[in-house]
Amino acid sequence: MPDFGANDLDAFWMPFTPNRRFKRHPRMLSSASGMWYRTPESREVLDATSGLWCVNAGHDRPKIREAIQKQAAEMDYAPCFNMGHPLAFQFASRLAQITPKGLDRIFFTNSGSESVDTALKIALAYHRARGKGTKTRLIGRERGYHGVGFGGISVGGIPKNRMYFGSLLTGVDHLPHTHGLPGNTCAKGQPENGAHLADDLERIVALHDASNIAAVIVEPVAGSTGVLIPPKGYLERLRAICDKHDILLIFDEVITGFGRVGAPFAAERFGVTPDLICMAKGLTNAAVPCGAVAASGKIYDAMMDGADAPIELFHGYTYSAHPLACAAGLATLETYREDDLFARAAGLEGYWQDAMHSLADARHVVDVRNLGLVAGIELEPRPGAPTARAMEVFETCFDEGLLIRVTGDIIALSPPLILEKDHIDRMVETIRRVLGQVD
């Protein structure tokens, strides 16, 4: 292994990482191709997490790599304030062809966190443009993850994401989560119980009045909190209540977008169309940072018609629609289409589901959840040391040649959509073996 001295490791303050623990036992990746990472020691590691839920088409896709190289040689950067470049408009048009019907106005960001904060700001500005400026309250959900911007952590519901950063945004409420309901343990696909929890939105409306509520934001499938699948009928109820009270519904599809659940977006999988969709990750196969918000025509038209200044939305980023990101995104969408990866994910769901639920009797496992090509395997916490068991499983799996993701005491799996059945078998065999080794 290369010599990573103390100074080499000290400079980088790593995100979402126990830095002190990492430096005692660093894990390094040096290259990637297809389903595999390679370490500096030339050891192969099977990617069961698509990097961080984002390399949906697999690593080192030639079409994407070559598009980035070509664009970098032609034009490395172009601003999109008061001017544009052709790829930005091409990318937006192509993306609008696969978003749910009616969500065809695209605002580019650089990450999922930025997409969430952008969607929240659009929701507030939309109501103001319609002369309903009192509609400012935002509704999130317990255990929700919406990135790390101040808007996202305010509507998010993971305590560790919130507790260190003060009072956050005011005027935010949270719906109850749907985790751990009786009768839902080891449900395959959508669980039967829990749709009634959406009705808590009516309680919040009664408390604050609909005239003060702007939007509800949820992940259709809550990923970072441990793969929580929405109960049957839950999202439909949220949509109906939002419609009843003129409240916008925002889907955070940063994880679920681009084939993860066997459809372009979870909105289509569940048959529920929101007013705004947040996306990132699989948008460019993670080759270049990029995010986007897809907005409905009614929102865009209201902003254009109700603007009280030449600039209809005072919002944007230096790197919005970055030329390299647009090149990567266009090539990524073409790769999804050429390889029919969304349908491929749907076709593998049955095998994936059976394989994941075969772990229900493995040591320490208390629940298994799945949808599309995503799964959560929940472990019994180690007494007096929550999260310690899952972290040890993560580290041991890596040493055994498998990259997984853990959140709390839950193993989260989200492999590239190019995986084969033998990859699934290997994941299950490794996880079962490691669970048998870890106390």
UniProtKB/Swiss-Prot annotation:
<dbReference type="GO" id="GO:0009102">
    <property type="term" value="P:biotin biosynthetic process"/>
</dbReference>
<dbReference type="InterPro" id="IPR015422">
    <property type="entry name" value="PyrdxlP-dep_Trfase_small"/>
</dbReference>
<dbReference type="GO" id="GO:0016223">
    <property type="term" value="F:beta-alanine:pyruvate transaminase activity"/>
</dbReference>
<dbReference type="InterPro" id="IPR005814">
    <property type="entry name" value="Aminotrans_3"/>
</dbReference>
<comment type="similarity">
    <text>Belongs to the class-III pyridoxal-phosphate-dependent aminotransferase family.</text>
</comment>
<dbReference type="Pfam" id="PF00202">
    <property type="entry name" value="Aminotran_3"/>
</dbReference>
<keyword id="KW-0808">Transferase</keyword>
<comment type="subunit">
    <text>Homotetramer.</text>
</comment>
<dbReference type="GO" id="GO:0004015">
    <property type="term" value="F:adenosylmethionine-8-amino-7-oxononanoate transaminase activity"/>
</dbReference>
<dbReference type="InterPro" id="IPR049704">
    <property type="entry name" value="Aminotrans_3_PPA_site"/>
</dbReference>
<protein>
    <recommendedName>
        <fullName>Omega-aminotransferase</fullName>
        <ecNumber>2.6.1.-</ecNumber>
        <ecNumber>2.6.1.18</ecNumber>
    </recommendedName>
</protein>
<feature type="binding site">
    <location>
        <position position="318"/>
    </location>
    <ligand>
        <name>pyridoxal 5'-phosphate</name>
    </ligand>
</feature>
<feature type="modified residue" description="N6-(pyridoxal phosphate)lysine">
    <location>
        <position position="281"/>
    </location>
</feature>
<dbReference type="InterPro" id="IPR015421">
    <property type="entry name" value="PyrdxlP-dep_Trfase_major"/>
</dbReference>
<keyword id="KW-0663">Pyridoxal phosphate</keyword>
<comment type="function">
    <text>Aminotransferase that can use beta-amino acids, aliphatic amines, or aromatic amines as amino donors, and pyruvate as amino acceptor. Shows high activity for short-chain beta-amino acids, with the highest activity for 3-aminobutanoate and beta-alanine in vitro. Displays higher activity toward aromatic amines than aliphatic amines. May be involved in beta-alanine biosynthesis and/or degradation.</text>
</comment>
<dbReference type="InterPro" id="IPR015424">
    <property type="entry name" value="PyrdxlP-dep_Trfase"/>
</dbReference>
<keyword id="KW-0032">Aminotransferase</keyword>
<keyword id="KW-0670">Pyruvate</keyword>
<dbReference type="GO" id="GO:0030170">
    <property type="term" value="F:pyridoxal phosphate binding"/>
</dbReference>
<feature type="binding site">
    <location>
        <begin position="112"/>
        <end position="113"/>
    </location>
    <ligand>
        <name>pyridoxal 5'-phosphate</name>
    </ligand>
</feature>
